[in-house]
Amino acid sequence: MSLSQRLKNLREDWKRIISVAKKPEKDTLNQSIKLTLLVMAIVGIIAYIIQLTVALLLH
């Protein structure tokens, strides 16, 4: 398969994905953003606790 054929197929795939995809509703988008921020905060807190624990144990 040539490079030009691959690019053509890739472009067709992108068109198909865009035609099938739909824009999320405002409520769904807000919920996804809140959930993402919550998970990031939890991971950050866990990382801080681990770092603090290691620092106190090594000090």
Swiss-Prot record:
TM stretches of this protein: 37-57
GO terms assigned for molecular function: protein transmembrane transporter activity
One GO BP: intracellular protein transmembrane transport
Domain of life: Archaea
Any single GO CC term annotated in Swiss-Prot or TrEMBL for this entry: plasma membrane
Membrane protein topology class: Single-pass membrane protein
InterPro entries linked to this entry: Prot_translocase_SecE_dom_sf, Translocase_Sec61-g, Translocase_SecE/Sec61-g
UniProt keyword annotation of Nucleotide-binding present: no
Annotated SUPFAM superfamilies: Preprotein translocase SecE subunit
Keyword Mitochondrion recorded: no
Cellular compartment(s): Cell membrane
Assigned keywords, A-Z: Cell membrane, Membrane, Protein transport, Translocation, Transmembrane, Transmembrane helix, Transport
Protein purpose: Essential subunit of the Sec protein translocation channel SecYEG. Clamps together the 2 halves of SecY. May contact the channel plug during translocation.
HAMAP family: SecE
Assembly with partners or alone: Component of the Sec protein translocase complex. Heterotrimer consisting of SecY (alpha), SecG (beta) and SecE (gamma) subunits. The heterotrimers can form oligomers, although 1 heterotrimer is thought to be able to translocate proteins. Interacts with the ribosome. May interact with SecDF, and other proteins may be involved.
Family: Belongs to the SecE/SEC61-gamma family.
NCBIfam families listed in its UniProt record: PRK09400.1-1, secE_euk_arch
Protein name: Protein translocase subunit SecE
Organism (species): Sulfurisphaera tokodaii (strain DSM 16993 / JCM 10545 / NBRC 100140 / 7) (Sulfolobus tokodaii)
